[in-house]
Swiss-Prot record:
InterPro entries noted in UniProt: 7tm6_olfct_rcpt (IPR004117)
GO terms for MF: ionotropic olfactory receptor activity; odorant binding; olfactory receptor activity
Extracellular face of the membrane: 62-71, 149-171, 276-285, 358-387
Keywords: Cell membrane, Membrane, Olfaction, Receptor, Sensory transduction, Transducer, Transmembrane, Transmembrane helix
One of the Pfam families matching this protein, by short name: 7tm_6
More about this protein: The atypical heteromeric and topological design of the odorant receptors appears to be an insect-specific solution for odor recognition, making the OR/Orco complex an attractive target for the development of highly selective insect repellents to disrupt olfactory-mediated host-seeking behaviors of insect disease vectors. Odor-evoked OR currents are independent of known G-protein-coupled second messenger pathways.
Function: Odorant receptor which mediates acceptance or avoidance behavior, depending on its substrates. The odorant receptor repertoire encodes a large collection of odor stimuli that vary widely in identity, intensity, and duration. May form a complex with Orco to form odorant-sensing units, providing sensitive and prolonged odorant signaling and calcium permeability.
SUBUNIT field: Interacts with Orco. Complexes exist early in the endomembrane system in olfactory sensory neurons (OSNs), coupling these complexes to the conserved ciliary trafficking pathway.
GO cellular component: cation channel complex; dendrite membrane; membrane; plasma membrane
Name of the protein described by the UniProt record: Putative odorant receptor 19b
GO biological process entries: detection of chemical stimulus involved in sensory perception of smell; signal transduction
Amino acid sequence: MDISKVDSTRALVNHWRIFRIMGIHPPGKRTFWGRHYTAYSMVWNVTFHICIWVSFSVNLLQSNSLETFCESLCVTMPHTLYMLKLINVRRMRGEMISSHWLLRLLDKRLGCADERQIIMAGIERAEFIFRTIFRGLACTVVLGIIYISASSEPTLMYPTWIPWNWKDSTSAYLATAMLHTTALMANATLVLNLSSYPGTYLILVSVHTKALALRVSKLGYGAPLPAVRMQAILVGYIHDHQIILRLFKSLERSLSMTCFLQFFSTACAQCTICYFLLFGNVGIMRFMNMLFLLVILTTETLLLCYTAELPCKEGESLLTAVYSCNWLSQSVNFRRLLLLMLARCQIPMILVSGVIVPISMKTFTVMIKGAYTMLTLLNEIRKTSLE
């Protein structure tokens, strides 16, 4: 990549390509696909999302024991959350696309090779996370296929209600297993995108904040400039900071409610999967299949909490940069403008879900403790039922 030409939106290209395949990012109406995209979107989402959700939900309602209920809940609840996330992306699509223009505007404000290197490092980090999640999901799907192949009796990757008799005939079983696995592969693609796109946006916001901090820290050093010129440069940096804050608030609006539901969903999934693995009678392949699912669901929330802390960390660096610039030798008007920027930088860039819950590693720890508490409660219920 040419260091003189940095495009932050490059990190988002794969995400929006997948969203187009998922049926929520229509192309131009002049193309053949664009004219028929609505029908395509309906067929895709009904086939791969609604049908699989109905089968998971009906299977959950037909549970006749605590073990089967836990096994069904740990796939039904996350899938329901992913459908809500997909609807939310469709609802906020216009605002998210418009943020690309703001990112390109910030790209044009980069002033030196060091700043461009910061943005490039952020893009590479986002792409690395995307590839890592892809590999993890691919391993999970492959393990599920191995589990199906190695099973001594007809089975599917995850507990699902099928409205026809698929166990008595080899041909019916093979057709059902292929359809079910194909649907889960499509959903794995959806999970890949919904798990990684928030982190990509948050990383881009954080690296642009870091680049701005580098620019601000250099203010007043080097060759002396007229007071009017210094004020104009500072005003430009204040505008850059306002753009970053607009991006951050846009992300918060896009992610707030679904992130709140994700904490609850992940805690429930951790609790139910652990209960099923600890107290259910499962073979080694089934155990590994559910264990990989647990790792994927936990990693998704861990990644969200980690990337949500990056803008806050770089916001603190920007505050330090304001103090570090050579403001002592500047004019009174410059200092007044700097005080305005300083006041805004003192407000931490903390992403909040559901109005009150901060998205952070501390919240992730609280979620783990909540899952353990629920697991303890389920264990007490199990002991009571055995007595």
